Swiss-Prot record:
Region (Disordered), start-end ranges: 168-187
Family: Belongs to the bacterial ribosomal protein bL9 family.
Keyword DNA-binding: no
Protein name: Large ribosomal subunit protein bL9
Signal peptide range in chain numbering: none
Keywords: Ribonucleoprotein, Ribosomal protein, RNA-binding, rRNA-binding
Function according to Swiss-Prot or TrEMBL: Binds to the 23S rRNA.
Biological processes annotated in GO: translation
Any one GO molecular-function label of the UniProt entry: rRNA binding
Gene3D superfamilies: Ribosomal protein L9, C-terminal domain (3.10.430.100), Ribosomal protein L9, N-terminal domain (3.40.5.10)
Protein's gene: rplI
Length: 187
């Protein structure tokens, strides 16, 4: 079934594209959600009339989402969960749990905005992508720990490891710069 996209849809196309999709996907998702119109001459003409308004609305929504994304950049959320000795969680952290934690941090998002490929089943720190708009997404750090103290210790250890890596890279960069200057002087 051919449809006209009314907004950008990941892995499908941009607004205004006429794409061929499976009939069930069109009937059950795209058409009821008002993300697409059936591709007919009348609907193509209607879309062309409405195109400027739709693009302006999309631009406004994208700008609002970008403003929220700028505020959410670098957001780290702690989730306290029970876990066994090996670090395996009793249960898992799902997209709904992540959405609730981000809401508790003061941002309004829905569960469907959280892109979690698989549920989180072990302790640790994870980067989870939150799609605020089809064109705007931000990565939120989810720190899953047994307690707040354990999370602080893990964060301190990660920061120390990052400092060690930076300290090791800095002399290497200085050596490369020195070699480049000596090569330039020889030439």
């Amino acid at each position: 079934m051919e449809v006209i996209l009314l907004e950008r849809i990941e892995k499908l196309g941009q607004m205004g594209d006429v794409v061929n999709v499976k009939p069930g996907f069109a009937r059950n998702f795209l058409l009821p959600q008002k993300k697409a119109l059936r591709a007919s001459k009348a609907n193509l003409a209607f879309f062309e009339k409405q195109r400027v308004q739709l693009e302006a609305l999309n631009l406004k929504r994208r700008d609002e989402a970008q403003a929220v994304a700028d505020k959410m950049t670098g957001l780290s959320v702690l989730m306290v969960r029970q876990a066994g000795e090996s670090g395996m969680l009793y249960g898992s952290v799902s997209g709904k749990d992540v959405a609730d934690a981000v809401k508790a941090a003061g941002f309004t998002i829905e569960r469907r905005m959280v892109n979690l490929d698989q549920p989180i089943k072990t302790l640790g720190s994870y980067g989870v992508r939150v799609s605020l708009h089809p064109e705007v997404s931000v990565v939120v750090t989810i720190n899953v720990a047994r307690s707040a103290e354990e999370a602080e210790r893990a964060a301190a250890a990660a920061a120390a490891a990052a400092e060690v890596v930076e300290a090791e890279e800095a002399p290497a960069e200085e050596d490369v710069a020195a070699e480049e200057t000596s090569e330039a002087a020889e030439a």
